Swiss-Prot record:
Gene that specifies this protein: tetM
SMART domains, alphabetized: EFG_IV
Role summary: Abolishes the inhibitory effect of tetracyclin on protein synthesis by a non-covalent modification of the ribosomes.
CDD domains named in the record: Tet_C, Tet_II, Tet_III, Tet_like_IV, TetM_like
Descriptive protein name: Tetracycline resistance protein TetM from transposon Tn1545
Length: 639
C-alpha cells in the first residue's frame, strides 16, 4: 500500500480543520462530520484549540482511499518565526494550501508558502468557501499570482450561485501554463505538431514535484463541494519521500505529546525500513530502546500495530525519545530533515499568580518545553525565579494560554528581554597551579582563549598529551569548560572563540577527574577576565511585503527600530523591503507595520546571526554553584 503524509495549511479561519473533517468523511474514515463551532472535530483535540477554533499543536489523523493511505498532519496556523514553520512541515510529502475565496491571500498564507518553497514540498492550492456570496475567482487568481506564484495551473471550471458545482477542465484548457514552461513543448506546439497527453502529464508532474508549478482546485469544505475530486487528486499527485527497497531503518521523532493520563507519546515519521514490535532500535551509537507498544492512525482512530513500514507515522509510548531523535541510520534522512532548530532569542521571568501553584507550574512547563524545543526554562537557584526562554511573542502567548486553559495555572509575566552572548576581546592565557592558594583542588590547569569570527561558535582543543593526562581527566576538563561557557563575565553564554587546554598537572595518589571538572570553569573565568569580553546581540534578517503606497512610511520608520534596509523592490504594486534588525526591536516594528498598513503587510524573519553591541553592557545575575563559588570569590579577590 502506498503511504503519503500531507499537510493542510492556511491562514486563520480559512477552513483547514473543516477541510480535514470533510476529507475524513468523504473517504469513509468517519461517519459523521465534526464541527469547529461545536468543538467536535477530530484534529483540534485540545480544549484550547476547540474553544478558540485554531490549531496550536500538530494533530494527526488518516484515511484510506483505494490503495493509498493518507496521513493528514493538521499543522499549526499561528507561527511568528520561520523556524517554527520549518519544524512542523519537515515530515510532509506534500501540502494543501487553503485560500479563502472571500479573503484571498493573507499574511499567514504567504509565510506558509514561503516555508513550503524553501523546504521543497509539492503544494496544491485549494480555494475554499466558493459557496459564499460576492466571490470573484478571477480576483483570487490574480491575488495568488501576485503574492504567491505566477506558475499556477487552473484545473477546474467553477459555476457559482445558484448551481454551485466544480468541473474539471478539458485537456486543451489546462495545459497552457505547462507548455509555456518548457521550451521543447512550446516549440513543438508552435510548429503545429501534436502534443501527446502523456508528455504533458509527465511535464506537469515533474514541475509539480520540483515546486515550480502549482495546481489550483476549488470547493467548499463546509458544504462538501469539490471534496471527492480533491481526494482523487491527493492520492494520485503526491508520492512518499521514502527510500523504496531500503531495508535499513530510519525514522525521526517530530512531535512529543502528553495524553490526558500524562502518558508521554513520541510521534515518528519512518523514512525507510520496517519497525517491528519488540525490536531493539538504535537511537545513537551507544543507546538502544525496545519497542513495547506501537500505534498508528487508521481511519481517524489510534490503533495498536505489530509493525510499521517506510512512510508511516507511528506513535510510541516512551520516556527517553526526544524531539528530533533519529531511529536507525541518520544518513537516510531527507536533506530537509537536517534543518537545525535555533536557540531562543528572548527570556522572561514567570511566576504563578497563586504561590501554592508553583509545583503545578513547573510540572506544566516540563511537559510544554519537552514538546517544544524552541521553549526552555530553568529555576535560578539564587533567586528561585523561573526563567523562560522562547523565540517570539505568539509562542509566548500560546504558552500562557496553555498554562491557564489546559493546566489551570494563571501566571504573572515580566517584560521579555533579549538573550545576549559574549565573545573574548583578545588572546589571553591563565594558569592555576596545584597546591598554590587559594586553589583547593588536586589539579593544575592552564587555558588560552582567542576570539574567532562571528558565527564560529566555540572551538576546543587540547595540547596536553593523552600519554600524560588520561582520557577521563581530559573529559573532565572539557566538561568543566562547557559548564564555564554557560556564564561569561556578564552572565551570558560565551561563543565565537577558541579555547585551548595547554597545561595540566595531577598527583596520582589523590587527583580525581572531579578536581579538574571543578577547577576548569574557574580558570576559564580568570582567562576571560584577562581577555575581556564584548556583548553580542541577535540580529534577524527580514523581508517585508507591503502595498506600494506604504513604501515611504515603512522605509522612514526603519531607523527608529535600528533596522537597516539593504534592498528595495517594486513588484505588482507591492514593495518588498529586505534588511537586518536587532531581535529586541522586531516586535515593535512588525506591530507598527501591521497597524499603519491595516494588516496588509507581511514580515518574514530568520536568525541572521549575532552582532557586537554598543553602549553599556547588559548583565544578568550569575547562577550560583555552591561547590566552586567560594573558590571563585577568592580568586576574583586576588586578580
Amino acid at each position: 500500500m502506498k503511504i503519503i503524509n500531507i499537510g493542510v495549511l492556511a491562514h486563520v479561519d480559512a477552513g483547514k480543520t473543516t477541510l480535514t473533517e470533510s476529507l475524513l468523511y468523504n473517504s469513509g474514515a468517519i461517519t459523521e462530520l465534526g464541527s469547529v463551532d461545536r468543538g467536535t472535530t477530530k484534529t483540534d483535540n485540545t480544549l484550547l484549540e476547540r474553544q478558540r477554533g485554531i490549531t496550536i499543536q500538530t494533530a494527526i489523523t488518516s484515511f484510506q482511499w483505494k490503495n493509498t493511505k493518507v496521513n493528514i498532519i493538521d499543522t499549526p496556523g499561528h507561527m511568528d518565526f520561520l523556524a517554527e514553520v520549518y519544524r512542523s512541515l519537515s515530515v510532509l510529502d506534500g501540502a494543501i494550501l487553503l485560500i479563502s475565496a472571500k479573503d484571498g491571500v493573507q499574511a499567514q498564507t504567504r509565510i506558509l508558502f514561503h516555508a513550503l518553497r524553501k523546504i521543497g514540498i509539492p503544494t496544491i492550492f485549494f480555494i475554499n468557501k466558493i459557496d459564499q456570496n460576492g466571490i470573484d475567482l478571477s480576483t483570487v487568481y490574480q491575488d495568488i499570482k501576485e503574492k504567491l506564484s505566477a506558475e499556477i495551473v487552473i484545473k477546474q471550471k467553477v459555476e457559482l450561485h445558484p448551481n454551485m458545482r466544480v468541473m474539471n477542465f478539458t485537456e486543451s484548457e489546462q495545459w497552457d501554463m505547462v507548455i509555456e514552461g518548457n521550451d521543447y513543448l512550446l516549440e513543438k506546439y508552435t510548429s503545429g505538431k501534436l502534443l501527446e497527453a502523456l508528455e504533458l502529464e509527465q511535464e506537469e508532474s515533474i514541475r509539480f514535484h520540483n515546486c515550480s508549478l502549482f495546481p489550483v482546485y476549488h470547493g467548499s469544505a463546509k458544504n462538501n463541494i469539490g471534496i471527492d475530486n480533491l481526494i482523487e487528486v491527493i492520492t494520485n499527485k503526491f508520492y512518499s519521500s521514502t527510500h523504496r527497497g531500503q531495508s535499513e531503518l530510519c525514522g525521526k521523532v517530530f512531535k512529543i505529546e502528553y495524553s490526558e493520563k500524562r502518558q508521554r507519546l513520541a510521534y515518528i515519521r519512518l523514512y525507510s525500513g520496517v519497525l517491528h514490535l519488540r525490536d531493539p532500535v538504535r537511537i545513537s551509537e551507544k543507546e538502544k530502546i525496545k519497542i513495547t507498544e506501537m500505534y498508528t492512525s487508521i481511519n481517524g482512530e489510534l490503533c495498536k500495530i505489530d509493525k510499521a513500514y517506510s512512510g508511516e507515522i507511528v506513535i510510541l509510548q516512551n520516556e527517553f525519545l526526544k524531539l528530533n531523535s533519529v531511529l536507525g541510520d541518520t544518513k537516510l534522512l531527507p536533506q530537509r530533515e537536517r534543518i537545525e532548530n535555533p536557540l531562543p532569542l528572548l527570556q522572561t521571568t514567570v511566576e504563578p499568580s497563586k504561590p501554592q501553584q508553583r509545583e503545578m507550574l513547573l510540572d506544566a512547563l516540563l511537559e510544554i518545553s519537552d514538546s517544544d524545543p524552541l521553549l526552555r526554562y530553568y529555576v535560578d537557584s539564587a533567586t528561585h525565579e523561573i526563567i523562560l526562554s522562547f523565540l517570539g511573542k505568539v509562542q509566548m502567548e500560546v504558552t500562557c494560554a496553555l498554562l491557564q486553559e489546559k493546566y489551570h495555572v494563571e501566571i504573572e509575566i515580566k517584560e521579555p528581554t533579549v538573550i545576549y552572548m559574549e565573545r573574548p576581546l583578545k588572546k589571553a592565557e591563565y594558569t592555576i597551579h596545584i597546591e598554590v592558594p587559594p586553589n583547593p583542588f588536586w589539579a593544575s590547569i592552564g587555558l588560552s582563549v582567542a576570539p574567532l569570527p562571528l558565527g564560529s561558535g566555540v572551538q576546543y582543543e587540547s595540547s596536553v598529551s593523552l600519554g600524560y593526562l588520561n582520557q577521563s581527566f581530559q573529559n573532565a576538563v572539557m566538561e568543566g569548560i562547557r559548564y564555564g561557557c554557560e556564564q561569561g563575565l556578564y552572565g551570558w553564554n560565551v561563543t565565537d572563540c577558541k579555547i585551548c587546554f595547554k597545561y595540566g598537572l595531577y598527583y596520582s595518589p589523590v587527583s580525581t577527574p572531579a578536581d579538574f571538572r571543578m577547577l576548569a570553569p574557574i580558570v576559564l573565568e580568570q582567562v576571560l577576565k584577562k581577555a575581556g569580553t564584548e556583548l553580542l546581540e541577535p540580529y534577524l534578517s527580514f523581508k517585508i511585503y507591503a502595498p506600494q503606497e506604504y513604501l515611504s512610511r515603512a522605509y522612514n520608520d526603519a531607523p527608529k527600530y535600528c533596522a537597516n534596509i539593504v534592498d528595495t523592490q517594486l513588484k505588482n504594486n507591492e514593495v518588498i523591503l529586505s534588511g537586518e534588525i536587532p531581535a529586541r526591536c522586531i516586535q515593535e516594528y512588525r506591530s507598527d507595520l501591521t497597524f499603519f498598513t491595516n494588516g496588509r503587510s507581511v514580515c518574514l524573519t530568520e536568525l541572521k546571526g549575532y552582532h557586537v553591541t554598543t553602549g553599556e553592557p547588559v548583565c544578568q545575575p550569575r547562577r550560583p554553584n555552591s561547590r566552586i563559588d567560594k573558590v571563585r570569590y577568592m580568586f576574583n579577590k586576588i586578580t
